[in-house]
């Protein structure tokens, strides 16, 4: 992640930073978008719904590009078993991607720890940021090994567990609660290799939401039903037990 001009520009108000983030999103300049929202978060210490979503979208795209790149490079490294030169190049490139991914994830985790979680209120905001914390520790776990992996896996589990407890105060159809269940179930499937627990969690969230679908508010109907579809898609994928190597589960 290169140093963005946003971090170097002086005299930018919070309003300016939000405007820059929106422009950067439209231009698909997600590094600039993330830089703007990082600076906004550090200046304000608290985010409204709009700013919260801008931060989430920015970093999801920034880290998502590195996660995808890592998978491709790691796959190439595994295939180059009979070519030492190609394998070495792929290994060096993978390590570079891992460093970038670690830097981005730790940047987000620092924002959460220092600014966002201490100021999180009400319940939906607390769940949102705890889920985000679980997500970014999960992304670290995808590339970590040995003791480092054990540590970030536990931290991801702890954050998701705290988020799940806090989410009990939200309706079962709330998109943040559903998104948490979706990502937590992916954690069990991909990181813990516990397909039974993943399916149990996803099915419980889906069934509970279906039971209260008639109470779903119009403003969240689209988001909630989309996540419910992702839950169902993952359940179908996992239940079939025929996932091709390289397939990636849906998360929010």
From Swiss-Prot:
<protein>
    <recommendedName>
        <fullName>14-3-3 protein homolog 1</fullName>
    </recommendedName>
</protein>
<dbReference type="InterPro" id="IPR000308">
    <property type="entry name" value="14-3-3"/>
</dbReference>
<dbReference type="InterPro" id="IPR036815">
    <property type="entry name" value="14-3-3_dom_sf"/>
</dbReference>
<dbReference type="Pfam" id="PF00244">
    <property type="entry name" value="14-3-3"/>
</dbReference>
<dbReference type="InterPro" id="IPR023410">
    <property type="entry name" value="14-3-3_domain"/>
</dbReference>
<dbReference type="InterPro" id="IPR023409">
    <property type="entry name" value="14-3-3_CS"/>
</dbReference>
<comment type="similarity">
    <text>Belongs to the 14-3-3 family.</text>
</comment>
């Amino acid at each position: 992640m290169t140093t963005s001009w946003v971090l170097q520009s002086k005299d930018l108000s919070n309003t300016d930073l939000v405007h820059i983030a929106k422009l950067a999103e439209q231009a698909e300049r997600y590094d600039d978008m993330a830089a703007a929202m990082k600076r906004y978060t550090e200046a304000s210490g608290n985010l409204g719904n709009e700013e919260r979503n801008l931060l989430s979208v920015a970093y999801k795209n920034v880290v998502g590009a590195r996660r995808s790149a890592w998978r491709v490079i790691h796959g190439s490294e595994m295939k180059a078993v009979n070519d030492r030169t190609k394998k070495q190049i792929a290994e060096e490139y993978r390590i570079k991607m891992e460093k970038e991914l670690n830097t981005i994830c730790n940047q987000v985790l620092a924002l959460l720890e220092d600014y966002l979680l201490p100021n999180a209120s009400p319940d939906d905001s607390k769940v949102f940021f705890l889920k985000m914390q679980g997500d970014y520790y999960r992304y670290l776990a995808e590339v970590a090994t040995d003791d480092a992996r054990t540590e970030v896996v536990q931290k991801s589990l702890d954050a998701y567990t705290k988020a799940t407890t806090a989410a009990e105060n939200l309706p079962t159809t709330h998109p943040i609660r559903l998104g948490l269940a979706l990502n937590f179930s992916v954690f069990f499937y991909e990181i813990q290799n516990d397909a039974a627990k993943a399916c149990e969690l996803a099915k419980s969230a889906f069934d509970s939401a279906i039971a209260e679908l008639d109470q779903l508010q119009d403003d969240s109907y689209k988001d909630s039903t989309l996540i419910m579809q992702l839950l169902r898609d993952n359940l179908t994928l996992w239940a079939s037990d025929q996932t091709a190597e390289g397939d990636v589960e849906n998360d929010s």
